[in-house]
A protein has these predicted regions:
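Membrane-embedded segments
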Residues: 64, 68-157
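Catalytic nucleophile-elbow at a beta strand-turn-alpha helix junction centered on a G-D-S/GDSL motif
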Residues: 58-72, 326-329
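Secreted/periplasmic serine-hydrolase-like ester/acetyl group-modifying domain
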Residues: 136-268, 356-396
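N-terminal Lys/Arg-rich, disordered targeting/topogenic segments
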Residues: 1-12
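C-terminal regions of proteins
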Residues: 284-367, 371-391
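Acidic-and-aromatic substrate-binding clefts and catalytic sites of carbohydrate-active enzymes
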Residues: 93-97, 248-254, 280-287
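Alpha-helical transmembrane signal-anchor/signal-peptide segments
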Residues: 33-57
Length: 396
């Protein structure tokens, strides 16, 4: 071998070794990075882990969105009433910017017959006051938490990378590098990780084992396929926007988010339905919701506005909510049953094709939830309302 050939060989050898070294290094860091993630709230972690623990193609419908999903849709109610399996891919404050990547994630992981995308949180941040009128620190802190609750519970994938790309620069104004290579952001947590934690993590990752994560036993949906219902009650004035047609156009930058969702819905084979759940809406938001409905329908995309159907659903604003935005167990059952029937009829959904073991698992979760949450919850709500009436309250 002459000197020139030897030099070329040496350079190529060093280059290949360097590439292999960094490939192994980054591969190892990517593999162990989830071990160092911050613990997030039990609802987001529980909801998303419930989704990932399900056998692929065992779920007919996935509801995507913020708390306006997990406080309104009860999977076991849908199963008992219609024989349809559903799960909630939801976390508090989920931004519309995250949803295109999450639609791909849901299809890749579960491939359901239908994805229902709830848009109330998207509309909530539409038409608000200018950014300079907000407390920027509080805005940053809130959005940081909302994004973390999603991506910290996702496996490393192109879809996770897209969610980060679509949210971190636009909502936080941050460089996405630390989020994409999350070891840069979380490596300081090493001191909280024990060797047994590492062994347990490695065993689960290498085996492909998936389970519902119940942080400190606080995730109340762990035994109920993600059902998260509250048994308290808060009085709200009755509202009815069924005949209200006024609209107000949303800002261009928010319209871009909606356009991306429309394009995504049209580009996938999976059926996509956009929806808003019912609540004591104000006129300030109703005009934007009407605009969004018209815009989606004009673009050939399906939209179901529950705020136009409160009478049909049977919503009682005085006793079906536990705060101004979310249904309690009594209201959640009403919404689940009504929307469930709409989905079954519109999309010709048939009973789920489950294994015998899965059928027993779903029925067991339904029975357990009915006994431990639904029955005592409705009873507690009715007793609370009765006490208010006995005290002379005119609200009930």
């Amino acid at each position: 071998m002459n000197k020139i050939a030897y030099k070329i060989y040496a350079v190529l050898k060093n280059l290949i070794c360097s590439v292999l070294f960094f490939a192994i290094l980054f591969g190892t860091l990517a593999f162990i990075a989830p071990l160092f993630r911050y613990e997030e709230d039990e609802i987001s972690t529980g909801n998303l882990s419930t989704f990932y623990a399900a056998r692929k193609e065992s779920v007919d419908v996935v509801f995507l969105g913020a708390s306006s999903v997990y406080r309104f849709f009860m999977p076991t109610v849908m199963y008992e009433k219609y024989g349809i399996t559903s799960l909630n891919y939801s976390s508090a404050g989920m931004a519309g910017e995250a949803m295109t990547g999450l639609i791909d994630e849901i299809i890749d992981v579960q491939n359901p017959k239908l994805i229902v995308v709830e848009l109330r949180d998207y509309i909530k941040w539409t038409g608000r006051v200018k950014e300079e009128d907000y407390d920027k620190d509080k805005w940053y802190e809130a959005q940081y938490s909302y994004i973390s609750r999603i991506v910290n519970n996702m496996p490393v994938s192109k879809n996770r990378a897209k969610v980060i790309h679509d949210t971190v620069p636009s909502l936080l104004g941050d460089d996405e590098l630390d989020w994409q290579f999350e070891f840069l952001k979380t490596h300081n947590n090493w001191k909280d990780i024990s060797f047994s934690d590492f062994l347990s993590f490695a065993r689960k990752e290498l085996s492909g084992e998936k389970e519902v994560i119940n942080l400190n036993g606080k995730y109340k949906g762990a035994d109920y396929k993600g059902n998260l219902a509250v048994s308290s009650v808060d009085y709200n004035e009755s509202v009815d926007w069924s005949d209200f047609t006024e609209t107000k156009e949303i800002e261009p930058e928010r319209l871009e988010v909606l356009d991306s969702l429309i394009n995504k819905a049209k580009s996938v084979d999976t059926e996509i339905l956009f929806l808003t759940t019912p609540y004591p809406e104000t006129e300030t938001l109703a005009v934007y919701e009407n605009f969004v409905q018209n815009y989606l329908e004009e673009n050939g995309v399906n939209f179901f506005n529950c705020n136009k159907k409160v009478k049909e659903i049977g919503i009682d604003f005085a006793s079906d909510f536990y705060d101004k935005k979310h249904t309690n167990v009594k209201g959640a059952v009403k919404v689940t049953e009504y929307v469930g029937k709409y989905l079954v009829d519109k999309y010709n959904l048939e009973k789920s094709n489950l294994t015998e073991e899965e059928q027993k698992e779903w029925q067991s979760a339904a029975d357990k939830w009915n006994k431990e949450v639904l029955e005592p919850g409705v009873k507690k709500i009715e007793e609370t309302v009765s006490k208010h009436k006995a005290k002379g309250s005119t609200n009930y």
